[in-house]
Swiss-Prot record:
Chain's role: Catalyzes the NADPH-dependent rearrangement and reduction of 1-deoxy-D-xylulose-5-phosphate (DXP) to 2-C-methyl-D-erythritol 4-phosphate (MEP).
One GO term of the biological process aspect: isopentenyl diphosphate biosynthetic process, methylerythritol 4-phosphate pathway involved in terpenoid biosynthetic process
Cofactor section: Mg(2+); Mn(2+)
Protein name as it appears in the record: 1-deoxy-D-xylulose 5-phosphate reductoisomerase
Keyword NADP included in the entry's annotation: yes
InterPro entries cross-referenced by the UniProt entry: DXP_reductoisomerase, DXP_reductoisomerase_C, DXP_reductoisomerase_N, DXPR_C, DXPR_C_sf, NAD(P)-bd_dom_sf
Catalysed conversion reaction: 2-C-methyl-D-erythritol 4-phosphate + NADP(+) = 1-deoxy-D-xylulose 5-phosphate + NADPH + H(+)
Pathway, per record: Isoprenoid biosynthesis; isopentenyl diphosphate biosynthesis via DXP pathway; isopentenyl diphosphate from 1-deoxy-D-xylulose 5-phosphate: step 1/6
Length: 396
């Protein structure tokens, strides 16, 4: 490869996108921004375009596109503005692109991420919903198109680093007994259960360790985030649900562990900063400076672990059940969760009603086989419809 790698960043204005740009900016000889995309923080997208001078920017609609195009021209940039899902897929699959950071949150990220996979790109996967929803279809596309899939979630990136390079032969074949996903436990790990009824969106978004967007912060509080990561781990590493264990580790220093049959346990440690897994995936199989401070074990002093309480975190139980059921269940779980979390953030439901809505959706609809992408989106739409009916029945 000659010259810097060309990078498309899908979801550039989110926390993962901004962290990616921070790492990229540290290595101008290695990486160049090809495209930036944004959905809502469009003034910030303009500022990022001015700083990083991409060839393309992608926004949700034509009205916004015209304004951004005018603003870019006024700034002396010839960045071309594309629109909608078609624009996202175009910059993900462009032949000039070497790597795609897939950091769009939620189901909206599936098609463009799949477009990058089908184009055989190096895909840095931060959009866990893509794998949760489409699982077998997604991994089949990775294999068929020769894409390189590198996980960005700190936990899956840690597992990737702790596994041997030939883990695709099968976990049993390389001597792995189980995978241990660590979780901080979120802001309500020790909150008395009776107080959870009155949790506000602001409290749920105040994560004690990580800096994240609002939706993923709520998912972390309910531990649905860890449930989605459990499903993602099953697909990434060809693991059965019973081979993936969740461990609460409040310090978030150990990002995950791999337990081998000979009694060895390998762990990846580091300060809780998403630039570490981003730099690891960008440079893989090499390593580059991420800008993250070295880990000071003497300052940390102590590492704690505990089992998750399913009464406190029912979403984790629901996610494991969906993983075991397979088929349409994970897509429905994800869709119902997206609807419920959005309603909680809008003040329409209470925190503890999130899990109830998801469980009602999953209980209502039998699990069906998922033979193609249309079936994935049909399951997603059905779950959103059922969740919407919950609001109608409860006058919300």
């Amino acid at each position: 490869m000659s010259g810097p790698q060309q990078i498309s960043i899908l979801g550039a204005t989110g926390s993962i996108g901004l962290s990616t740009l921070d790492v990229v900016a540290r290595h101008p000889a290695l990486y160049q921004v090809f495209a930036l995309t944004g959905f809502s923080r469009l003034d910030e997208l303009l500022a990022l375009c001015i700083r990083h001078t991409p060839q393309y920017a992608v926004v949700p609609d034509q009205v916004v596109a015209r304004k951004l195009q005018d603003d870019l021209a006024a700034a002396g940039l010839d960045t071309r503005v594309l629109v909608g899902e078609g624009g996202l897929c175009e910059v993900a699959a462009d032949p000039r692109v070497d790597a795609v950071m897939a950091a769009i949150v939620g189901a909206a990220g599936l098609r463009p991420t799949l477009a990058a996979v089908e184009a055989g790109k190096k895909v840095l996967l931060a959009n866990k919903e893509a794998l949760v929803m489409s699982g077998a279809l997604f991994m089949q596309a990775v294999r068929q198109n020769g894409a390189v899939l590198l996980p960005i979630d700190s936990e899956h990136n840690a597992i990737f680093q702790c596994l041997p390079g030939d883990f695709a032969r099968g976990l049993g074949a390389v001597g792995v007994r189980r995978i241990m996903l660590t979780a901080s436990g979120g802001p309500f790990r020790e909150t008395p259960l009776e107080q959870l009824h009155n949790v506000t969106p602001e409290q749920a978004c105040a994560h004690p360790v990580w800096s994240m967007g609002r939706k993923i912060s709520v998912d972390s509080a309910t531990m649905m985030n860890k449930g989605l990561e459990l499903i993602e781990a099953c697909w990434l590493f060809d693991a059965r649900p019973d081979q993936v264990e969740v461990v609460i580790h409040p310090q978030s220093v150990i990002h995950s562990l791999v337990d081998y049959v000979d009694g060895s346990v390998l762990a990846q440690l580091g300060n809780p900063d998403m630039r570490t897994p981003i730099a690891n995936a960008l440079a893989w199989p090499a390593r580059v400076d991420s800008g993250v401070a070295p880990l000071d074990l003497f300052r940390i002093g102590q590492l704690d672990f505990q089992a998750p309480d399913e009464e406190r975190f029912p979403c984790l139980r629901l996610a494991r059940q969906a993983a075991e059921a397979g088929g349409s269940a994970p897509a429905m779980l994800n869709a119902a969760n997206e609807v419920a979390v959005a309603a909680f953030l809008d003040g329409r439901i209470r925190y503890l009603e999130i899990a109830g809505i998801i469980e009602e959706v999953l209980d209502h609809e039998p699990v069906t086989a998922v033979e193609g992408l249309e079936a994935v989106f049909a399951a997603d739409a059905k779950a959103r419809l059922l969740a919407g009916q919950w609001f109608e029945r409860h006058g919300r």
